[in-house]
Amino acid sequence: MPTTPDLIVLHEHPEWQKPLFAALQRRGVAFEPFDVTRAAFSNTAPPRARLYFNQASPSAYLRGNTRAVPLALAYMRTLQQQGARVLNGADVFALELSKSVQATLLQTLGIDTPRSITFNEAAALRAHAHEITWPAVLKPDQGGSGARIEVVESIEQVEAIFRRDPSYWLPDNLFLLQEYLPHDPEQGIVRLEFLGGQLLYAMRVKTHGRFNLCPSPVCNPDDGDGICEIPAAVEAPPVEFFAYPEVPAAAVATAQRIVQAARLDVGGIEYLETPDGRRVFYDINANSNLRPSVAAEFGFDPFERVVDYLVAQLRA
């Protein structure tokens, strides 16, 4: 690795990063990976690189890397206090780590998003019984890879889930009970990938009832089952991804507002459309696992585009 890299990439899942690292090497970019799963940093050491790019994931704990998230957050805050440029930095990562804060941001922007109740004790939901419609979606505040997301029918069922397995609260001891919104399963949900504030591509994702919608071919390959730490909660066909060139301009404009408000450098925004015509935005992803097969239908390699962006930032 170069002793004085221009770029340092924070990460915790080497398989996800292989295409990006290969593209950086092809282009001759002086970069260095920084694996936050087993790391240390000095608060007195100055930044080594001109640019840092955060690719750490909230789902790190699912791979036994629980300590990666606080290390990444602390390191980025230190770097930024020292004046370093960090793409998808500490504030963006903190937003990605909290579905509750994401929901509040969307509401503040006047964007339709599922009603949510955040809680750290299942019994406390009873005080909000008048706000809940059933079924509802139970999901962790620190999400990732669709883990621990369930459709539930009652407060009693929620209480039973945590009583049966207290470790369900981990890693952050916060959950959301969120409005359940049906959508056309043939249309799926929509994910918009952004790079530098501009739409890179849009895709439709047919979930088949699954919640792990990770676009990385490592997790959801085009030709079969992936290597993923999240077992499928239901017996269902694999998740399918389709290029969506006809994505409505209004949806793109709304997503751009989210990207700008979140100060997201690279990432994905997800929404669904309900049978009664609501377009509901519900997820902000800073760690964007790009889908080469979808981007190929638009005529480009998405990782080459990311390298174009990183090189432009180095020259800025």
Regions found by a protein language model. Give the residues of each.
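Conserved N-proximal alpha/beta basic substrate-recognition cap immediately N-terminal to
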Residues: 12-115
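Short, solvent-exposed loop/turn elements at beta->coil junctions and helix N-caps
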Residues: 40-41, 178-183, 271-272
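Short glycine-rich anion-binding loops that position phosphate/pyrophosphate groups of nucleotides
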Residues: 57-60, 142-143, 287
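Phosphate-binding site of ATP-dependent enzymes
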Residues: 150-259
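C-terminal active-site "lid" helix and adjoining low-complexity regulatory extension at the edge
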Residues: 245-246, 250, 259-266, 273-316
